[in-house]
Structure formats: C-alpha cells, structure tokens
C-alpha cells in the first residue's frame, strides 16, 4: 500500500478519480475496445467509472478500469501537451505508468511517467464529456483529483435496491 494525499491505496479496492466539481473520470460510453476515450462525467455508480491502482513498482501505478479491465494509457504513446487519454490492454510500456503526487490541499496530481505530464482536461472544461489529456504542470485545480475509495457495500446495496424496483418483464 502507498499513501497519496489523504488516501491509502490498496490493490484490492476500487477508486473514483474525482475532479473538484465531483465529476469523475470514466471510459466513454462504457466501450470495452482498445482506444476508447477517457472523459469526465457525473458519477452514477457504474463500474466504468471506477479504477483500481495496480502497483507497477518504483512508486508507479497502472490505473485499471473495473468494467473493461484495461489501463489508462496515452493515445498513440504520445508525450506532448494535449495527448488524449484512452484505455488499452496492459502493456509493459511506461505510457501506462503513473506517479501520484499529493497537493497541499489534500488532493492528488497524477503524472504520467513517460511524458512527465499530468492528467488534465481539454480546455480546462469541467462539464460532462470533457476529454482527459496530459499537460505540463500548472498550479490549477484542473490537474488535482480526489481519489475516493468505492464502498463495495454501498455498491451492492444500490444494485439490490435497483433490482427490487425494476418492473417484471411482461
């Protein structure tokens, strides 16, 4: 386990990667294919909005989606500002390795090891659908994230409640 901001990460847990406005990173349209975009969206309890931090050694992490099992990666292995984030099956490449850096405000900056740039949002947009990208460090909230553990009991309870309220097929 390693500490990032105020969150102790465990490989056995899933986390939300939350922007300061409460929206989370997710796989666009719950797409399971390599190359599916990573974007910002309102949290709705879906597994494509949940992430596992997999220890990659040397203080590095791979970030794996709960629904697809794929890793956050740099599109086309790009390292320049504005390179979009997408998901890809696990590789040994550093484009899937991330370092977690705590901020003074208790949030976390997530830096790609290969590019030495941070997870950011295109145009500093914080609305639903904003594309995630990498960018050189700036001292703004658009590069700061809350890593919030998903409560598995709450997830199971929510699923059971939804199941009870689903109408029977006719």
Where are these regions (language model features)?
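Generic preference for hydrophobic/aromatic residues in regular secondary structure cores
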Residues: 17, 38, 42, 63, ...
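IQ-motif-like calmodulin-binding regions
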Residues: 129
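Extended, hydrophobic interaction surfaces within ordered domains
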Residues: 133-134, 139, 145-146
């Amino acid at each position: 386990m390693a500490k990032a901001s105020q969150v102790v990460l465990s490989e056995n847990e899933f986390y939300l990667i939350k922007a300061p406005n409460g929206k989370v990173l997710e796989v666009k349209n719950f797409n399971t294919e390599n190359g599916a975009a990573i974007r910002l969206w309102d949290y709705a309890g879906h597994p494509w909005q949940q992430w596992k931090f997999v220890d990659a050694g040397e203080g590095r992490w791979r970030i794996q989606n709960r629904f697809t099992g794929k890793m956050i990666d740099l599109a086309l292995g790009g390292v320049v500002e504005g390179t979009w984030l997408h998901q890809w099956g696990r590789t040994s490449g550093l484009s899937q390795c991330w370092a977690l850096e705590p901020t003074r405000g208790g949030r976390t900056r997530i830096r790609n090891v290969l590019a030495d740039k941070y997870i950011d949002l295109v145009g500093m947009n914080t609305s639903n659908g904003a594309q995630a990208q990498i960018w050189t460090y700036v001292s703004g909230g658009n590069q700061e994230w809350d890593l919030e553990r998903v409560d598995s009991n709450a997830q199971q309870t929510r699923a059971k409640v939804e199941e009870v309220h689903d109408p029977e097929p006719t």
